[in-house]
Regions:
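Phosphopantetheinylated carrier protein domains
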Residues: 65-67
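Short, charged amphipathic alpha-helical surface segments
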Residues: 53, 69-109
Length: 109
């Protein structure tokens, strides 16, 4: 078992975020000492922590990560495809804004 600090170092998730993930039920420690409250994680939970980190980095909200953390590959693939479409739409909007900005800038001269 890994204490929270060691798990934090290995997973690259801050202790504060691990506590938050525990509170919201996203990543529960394998065990927690009833007297001290110390959290201990199993090494096998590092894969789950990695999936959570990747999904966070891709912009998924915590609520959806909770659903996807244990999803099968098909459900995860659909969610990733949906997120890719959202990002592409956002990029398109930003490109249009940039074009508008450049046109406006030329008018200022």
């Amino acid at each position: 078992m890994l204490q929270i600090g060691e798990f934090s170092r290995l997973s690259r998730i801050s202790v504060r975020m691990l506590r938050h993930y525990d509170q919201v039920g996203l990543l529960k420690p394998a065990e927690q000492d009833a007297q001290t409250g110390y959290r201990r994680y199993a090494a096998s939970q590092l894969a789950e922590a990695n999936r959570i980190t990747v999904l966070r980095d891709l912009g998924f909200p915590i609520r959806e990560i909770g659903r996807l953390a244990h999803a099968d590959d098909g459900e995860l693939a659909r969610a990733l495809d949906d997120r890719a479409r959202e990002l592409e739409e956002g990029i398109g909007r930003e490109q249009r804004r940039l074009a508008d900005l450049r046109r406006f800038r030329q008018e200022v001269e």
